[in-house]
């Protein structure tokens, strides 16, 4: 006990020394003098620990007060006279100590004497209520001294608060400009409802599989795209980095759409509040364009002439984009209104992401749901307009003659890539913050369904307004737009509001919806870029991440300024036409090839099925319908497997070849744009593909410098753990030929539970978590022990193997072991670990074996649980006496006594509240520990009464395999549970505190450490 006390004190001293090293970094002379003085104190303190522990503890308190005073001086100097954010905590310098220190020392053995407790005086805190922080404190822009203090607190990875936040964030990322602006433009361009056929085909056969691939990669690894592919295999890290790099130009040019929507929102709100007419209702003389401008209320005469456009189209090109003519391709000066709108857009993005997942989730709850409400309101208003049926008929009419053009299939594939966001890695990054056991396949299916429904809803809203304009202008739907339909949301809908009552209100709602739908995708792009760099440099400090996000927003604003120029629309148009094209098809094809063909689709689906706890089913005639559906359409089923292996590669290859062979120059308003803008678009969108060979070359160079073989480029050791580590790769073994050769390569097989989920209280929920589960209180402690064990041996295995062992071996297969420690007159039943190693003269160890013929008092999960009689000491003595008698008087002439079959242990289904199994092929059965001849005698004294308070018991479990249930008796594992007297009235559950290590040689599993509790108490301390 004294050794443990000293060890804990030495740990406190080392922590104090590290704290002094942090203080030493200050440049203040007074602080330097205090650190030198602290060094001398620490040297003296280390000497006192060996000689006098009590004196060392008291002197340690003085050192802590000295360090606290030094830290107060540091904080006072860094604040530069400013008022503190939190109220100061005043302590007595003579005998003050921090609460964690007092709890640590008081809980150590040997410090429970009254004289020691009196010397450690903890003064009461005068005021612990913090002041309300200022609004600028939310930005967490700390000084360097504050970063040193907060770095350890923030070194923890965030998770989504709920799975609803994760789903809404993914939905908000998908639902945006691709639905409200791009999808109606594609339908309008390809002649209506015929576009739905290739669109739905693309969603089903490579949209959903690729969404599931991205989400499962992120959730399985818990990392961004670059680190996820790095863990899969080093040669694939280039694909992950390409998915990150390609997001940078997309995030820059994507935000200019938000800037346009903000400008329209401001103009609409201005007209609504001031009561003025909307600026796009009538034509103006300063709008000098090549086409004739027509007022909305004079559409009949306007559309009878050629080269005429509506007032909303003229407003967008002349007022918003500041184009003089469609043939003027000069870049021109910056437009002040677009610069201000772009700055507002990046400010909104920063306020949405600066608090991490918490702020993103809160923002996404609004931006992902409010657009659906606004779209529903706009749809009801749109279908009530005269002529709306004309536009809806155009939307749902299928012209089969256009179905055989390859352009429509290419456009549908591009639209699917653009909508779902599978052309980059935001889905991987968002899934990395999800729980490990989350049903990611269900989320993938729901996201794709919601994506298709949103596209249909947006199309109905836009085309109801297009039909209304066509009816008012007495023209066909095909003739409403004279220019590129890509900007249909900014040219069609503003004109509709002029014919409505409260047109300013409806315009404000529409463009507010457009801002919300577009900006949440920007959150995902920025968070993915920041997460990739934070993971690459192994940083988790929130202050550093916030500064990185602020830098990305500032850099995005300056990089987006060329798009705010007079000719910036041409650069935007070139990038928009090349996005989700060659780059998306190439990266998707490389991702599928690495996962399905290099790593192996069967291996990957086995890993994901183990993560989701979905078995790989083999169907037969007796298979139920539910299992057949899982076999064909489950996460590891035929649909996903063949879609990723055959359909996706074929379609992506055909689309890539068709895009290369059918490439045409980019044009705007019927005129080809200058080659300079097109080259910029090529560099921005196709350039990230060069990252793949560049990173692969760097990986090869690193492998050669480390002296490894090239096959290590395809090493998957970081992806999943190996079940069989008994044979080391560097070991040599003798074959039949007698030559020493290298052992054959063994394919790593996945385990049902990963190594890290056996860690105690793993915060990421990757595996069974320790969670409360209330059990009925019985008359004994045995149900607790049986419930804590993972007893999964079947009756047939026990009956077949029990008869092959001797009576002595069979006595060690199915039992429950408990140990009691007697401290003078108090009896204690130890529920954890082996009996105490150091016992005094007055302490006795009693170990007993409960027989297999115990009565049963109740059932737990429909499994009978044996019950320990109330009088435990008497039964222990009687059973131990019988065992000694059998062992002491054996007779060689006696016939062998047949061993009766042992009762099966209870089968417990795996649940998150129970301790995890060691691996997928291991199960546990209890072991009987019978006291041998050298065991201490068990006396049936009066002290061993049934009224004694049993506080602990020990469960010893034996690890066996399915193939040989009782052969490896040498590999025993122990798992600990804790029950204190206060746990019984509260009905506390059992919690696993054993930490296992799966990466041990020869397949042995050992207990690395056991968390020990202090001595149980009967009532809370005063």
UniProtKB/Swiss-Prot annotation:
<keyword id="KW-0769">Symport</keyword>
<dbReference type="InterPro" id="IPR037272">
    <property type="entry name" value="SNS_sf"/>
</dbReference>
<keyword id="KW-0472">Membrane</keyword>
<dbReference type="GO" id="GO:1903804">
    <property type="term" value="P:glycine import across plasma membrane"/>
</dbReference>
<dbReference type="GO" id="GO:0005886">
    <property type="term" value="C:plasma membrane"/>
</dbReference>
<comment type="subunit">
    <text>May interact with STAT family transcription factor sta-2; the interaction is probably direct.</text>
</comment>
<comment type="similarity">
    <text>Belongs to the sodium:neurotransmitter symporter (SNF) (TC 2.A.22) family.</text>
</comment>
<dbReference type="InterPro" id="IPR000175">
    <property type="entry name" value="Na/ntran_symport"/>
</dbReference>
<feature type="transmembrane region" description="Helical">
    <location>
        <begin position="642"/>
        <end position="662"/>
    </location>
</feature>
<feature type="compositionally biased region" description="Pro residues">
    <location>
        <begin position="893"/>
        <end position="907"/>
    </location>
</feature>
<feature type="topological domain" description="Cytoplasmic">
    <location>
        <begin position="1"/>
        <end position="165"/>
    </location>
</feature>
<feature type="topological domain" description="Extracellular">
    <location>
        <begin position="663"/>
        <end position="677"/>
    </location>
</feature>
<feature type="compositionally biased region" description="Low complexity">
    <location>
        <begin position="933"/>
        <end position="943"/>
    </location>
</feature>
<dbReference type="GO" id="GO:0015179">
    <property type="term" value="F:L-amino acid transmembrane transporter activity"/>
</dbReference>
<feature type="transmembrane region" description="Helical">
    <location>
        <begin position="166"/>
        <end position="185"/>
    </location>
</feature>
<feature type="topological domain" description="Extracellular">
    <location>
        <begin position="263"/>
        <end position="337"/>
    </location>
</feature>
<feature type="topological domain" description="Extracellular">
    <location>
        <begin position="381"/>
        <end position="412"/>
    </location>
</feature>
<feature type="topological domain" description="Cytoplasmic">
    <location>
        <begin position="520"/>
        <end position="550"/>
    </location>
</feature>
<dbReference type="GO" id="GO:0002804">
    <property type="term" value="P:positive regulation of antifungal peptide production"/>
</dbReference>
<feature type="transmembrane region" description="Helical">
    <location>
        <begin position="193"/>
        <end position="213"/>
    </location>
</feature>
<keyword id="KW-0812">Transmembrane</keyword>
<feature type="topological domain" description="Cytoplasmic">
    <location>
        <begin position="606"/>
        <end position="641"/>
    </location>
</feature>
<feature type="transmembrane region" description="Helical">
    <location>
        <begin position="338"/>
        <end position="358"/>
    </location>
</feature>
<feature type="topological domain" description="Cytoplasmic">
    <location>
        <begin position="699"/>
        <end position="1022"/>
    </location>
</feature>
<dbReference type="GO" id="GO:0097677">
    <property type="term" value="F:STAT family protein binding"/>
</dbReference>
<keyword id="KW-0813">Transport</keyword>
<feature type="transmembrane region" description="Helical">
    <location>
        <begin position="585"/>
        <end position="605"/>
    </location>
</feature>
<feature type="transmembrane region" description="Helical">
    <location>
        <begin position="242"/>
        <end position="262"/>
    </location>
</feature>
<feature type="transmembrane region" description="Helical">
    <location>
        <begin position="445"/>
        <end position="465"/>
    </location>
</feature>
<comment type="function">
    <text>Probably mediates sodium-dependent uptake of unknown small molecule(s). By positively modulating expression, in the epidermis, of antimicrobial peptides such as nlp-29, plays a role in resistance to fungal infection and in the response to physical wounding and phorbol ester PMA treatment. Role in response to wounding of the epidermis may be facilitated by recruitment of snf-12 to the wound site by microtubule-dependent vesicle trafficking.</text>
</comment>
<feature type="topological domain" description="Extracellular">
    <location>
        <begin position="186"/>
        <end position="192"/>
    </location>
</feature>
<feature type="topological domain" description="Cytoplasmic">
    <location>
        <position position="359"/>
    </location>
</feature>
<dbReference type="GO" id="GO:0005283">
    <property type="term" value="F:amino acid:sodium symporter activity"/>
</dbReference>
<keyword id="KW-1133">Transmembrane helix</keyword>
<feature type="transmembrane region" description="Helical">
    <location>
        <begin position="678"/>
        <end position="698"/>
    </location>
</feature>
<feature type="transmembrane region" description="Helical">
    <location>
        <begin position="360"/>
        <end position="380"/>
    </location>
</feature>
<feature type="transmembrane region" description="Helical">
    <location>
        <begin position="413"/>
        <end position="433"/>
    </location>
</feature>
<feature type="transmembrane region" description="Helical">
    <location>
        <begin position="499"/>
        <end position="519"/>
    </location>
</feature>
<feature type="topological domain" description="Cytoplasmic">
    <location>
        <begin position="434"/>
        <end position="444"/>
    </location>
</feature>
<dbReference type="GO" id="GO:0045177">
    <property type="term" value="C:apical part of cell"/>
</dbReference>
<feature type="transmembrane region" description="Helical">
    <location>
        <begin position="551"/>
        <end position="571"/>
    </location>
</feature>
<feature type="topological domain" description="Cytoplasmic">
    <location>
        <begin position="214"/>
        <end position="241"/>
    </location>
</feature>
């Amino acid at each position: 006990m004294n050794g443990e006390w000293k060890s804990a004190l030495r740990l406190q001293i080392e922590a104090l020394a590290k704290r002094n090293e942090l203080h030493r970094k200050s440049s203040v002379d007074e602080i330097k003098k205090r650190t030198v003085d602290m060094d001398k104190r620490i040297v003296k303190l280390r000497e006192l620990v060996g000689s006098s522990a009590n004196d060392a503890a008291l002197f340690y308190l003085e050192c802590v007060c000295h360090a606290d005073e030094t830290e107060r001086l540091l904080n006072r100097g860094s604040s530069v006279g400013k008022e503190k954010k939190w109220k100061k905590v005043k302590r007595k310098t003579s005998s003050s100590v921090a609460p964690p220190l007092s709890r640590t020392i008081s809980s150590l053995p040997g410090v429970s004497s009254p004289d020691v407790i009196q010397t450690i005086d903890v003064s009461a805190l005068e005021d612990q209520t913090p002041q309300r922080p200022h609004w600028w404190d939310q930005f967490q822009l700390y000084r360097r001294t504050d970063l040193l203090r907060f770095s350890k607190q923030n070194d923890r990875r965030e998770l989504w608060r709920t799975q609803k936040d994760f789903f809404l964030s993914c939905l908000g990322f998908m639902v945006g400009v691709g639905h409200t602006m791009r999808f109606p433009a594609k339908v309008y361009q390809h002649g209506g409802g015929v576009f739905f056929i290739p669109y739905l085909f693309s969603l089903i056969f490579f949209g959903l599989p690729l969404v599931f691939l991205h989400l499962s990669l992120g959730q399985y690894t818990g990392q961004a795209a670059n680190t996820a592919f790095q863990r899969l295999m080093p040669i694939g890290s280039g694909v992950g980095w390409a998915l990150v790099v390609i997001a940078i130009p997309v995030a820059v040019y994507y935000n200019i759409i938000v800037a346009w929507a903000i400008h329209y929102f401001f103009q609409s709100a201005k007209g609504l509040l001031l009561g003025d007419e909307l600026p796009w209702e009538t034509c103006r003389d300063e709008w000098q364009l090549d086409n004739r401008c027509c007022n909305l209320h004079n559409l009949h005469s306007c559309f009878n002439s050629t080269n005429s456009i509506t007032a909303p189209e003229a407003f967008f090109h002349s007022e918003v984009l500041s184009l003089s003519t469609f043939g003027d391709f000069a870049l021109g000066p910056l437009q002040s209104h677009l610069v201000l709108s772009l700055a507002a857009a990046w400010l909104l993005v920063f306020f949405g992401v600066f608090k991490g997942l918490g702020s993103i989730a809160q923002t996404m709850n609004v931006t992902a749901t409010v657009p659906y409400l606004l779209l529903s309101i706009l749809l009801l208003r749109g279908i009530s307009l005269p002529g709306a049926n004309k536009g809806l008929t155009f939307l749902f009419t299928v012209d089969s003659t256009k179905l055989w053009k390859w352009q429509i299939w290419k456009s549908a594939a591009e639209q699917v890539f653009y909508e779902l966001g599978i052309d980059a890695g935001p889905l991987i990054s968002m899934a990395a913050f999800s729980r490990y056991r989350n049903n990611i396949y269900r989320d993938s299916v729901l996201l794709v369904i919601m994506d298709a429904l949103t596209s249909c809803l947006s199309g109905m809203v836009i085309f109801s307004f297009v039909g209304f304009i066509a009816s008012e202008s007495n023209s066909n739907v095909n003739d409403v737009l004279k220019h590129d339909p890509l900007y249909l949301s900014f040219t069609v809908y503003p004109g509709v509001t002029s014919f409505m009552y409260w047109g300013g209100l409806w315009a404000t709602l529409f463009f507010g919806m457009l801002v919300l739908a577009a900006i949440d995708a920007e959150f995902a792009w920025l968070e993915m870029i920041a997460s990739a760099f934070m993971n690459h440099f192994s940083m988790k400090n929130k202050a550093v991440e916030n500064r990185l996000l602020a830098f990305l927003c500032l850099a995005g604003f300056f990089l987006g300024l060329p798009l705010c120029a007079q000719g910036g629309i041409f650069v935007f148009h070139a990038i928009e036409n090349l996005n989700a094209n060659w780059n998306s098809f190439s990266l998707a094809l490389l991702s599928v090839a690495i996962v399905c063909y290099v790593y192996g689709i069967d291996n990957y689906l086995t890993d994901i099925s183990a993560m989701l706890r979905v078995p790989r089913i083999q169907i037969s005639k007796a298979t139920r319908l539910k299992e057949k559906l899982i076999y064909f359409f489950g996460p590891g089923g035929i649909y996903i497997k063949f879609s990723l292996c055959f359909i996706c590669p074929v379609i992506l290859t055909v689309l890539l070849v068709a895009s290369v062979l059918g490439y045409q120059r980019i044009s705007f308003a019927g005129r080809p744009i200058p080659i300079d803008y097109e080259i910029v678009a090529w560099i921005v969108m196709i350039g990230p593909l060069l990252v793949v060979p560049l990173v692969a070359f760097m990986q090869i160079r690193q492998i050669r410098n480390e002296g490894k073989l090239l096959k290590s480029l395809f090493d998957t050791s970081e992806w999943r753990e190996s079940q069989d580590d008994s044979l080391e790769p560097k070991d040599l073994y003798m074959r039949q030929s007698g030559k020493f050769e290298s052992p054959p390569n063994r394919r790593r097989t996945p385990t049902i539970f990963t190594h890290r989920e056996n860690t105690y209280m793993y915060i990421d929920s990757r595996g069974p978590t320790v969670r409360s589960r209330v059990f009925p209180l019985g008359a004994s402690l045995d149900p607790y022990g049986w419930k804590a064990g993972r007893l999964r041996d079947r009756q047939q295995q026990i009956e077949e193997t029990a008869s092959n062992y001797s009576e002595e071996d069979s006595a060690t297969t199915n039992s429950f072991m408990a140990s009691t420690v007697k401290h003078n007159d108090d009896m204690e039943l130890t529920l954890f670990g082996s009996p105490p190693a150091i016992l005094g003269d007055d302490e006795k160890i009693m170990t007993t074996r409960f027989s297999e013929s115990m009565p049963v008092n109740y059932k737990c999960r429909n499994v009978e649980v044996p019950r320990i009689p109330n009088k435990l000491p008497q039964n222990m003595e009687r059973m131990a006496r019988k065992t000694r008698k059998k062992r002491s008087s054996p007779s060689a002439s006696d016939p062998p006594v047949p061993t009766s079959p042992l009762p099966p242990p209870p089968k417990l289904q795996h649940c998150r509240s129970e301790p995890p199994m060691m691996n997928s092929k291991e199960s546990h059965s209890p072991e009987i520990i019978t006291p041998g001849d050298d065991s201490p005698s068990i006396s049936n004294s009066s002290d061993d009464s049934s009224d004694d308070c049993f506080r602990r018991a020990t469960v010893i479990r034996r690890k066996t395999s399915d193939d040989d249930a009782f052969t490896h008796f040498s590999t025993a594992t122990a798992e600990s549970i804790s029950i204190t007297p206060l746990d019984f009235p509260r009905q506390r559950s059992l919690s696993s505190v054993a930490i296992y290590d799966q990466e041990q040689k020869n397949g042995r599993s050992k207990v690395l450490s056991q968390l020990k509790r202090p001595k149980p108490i009967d009532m809370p301390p005063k």
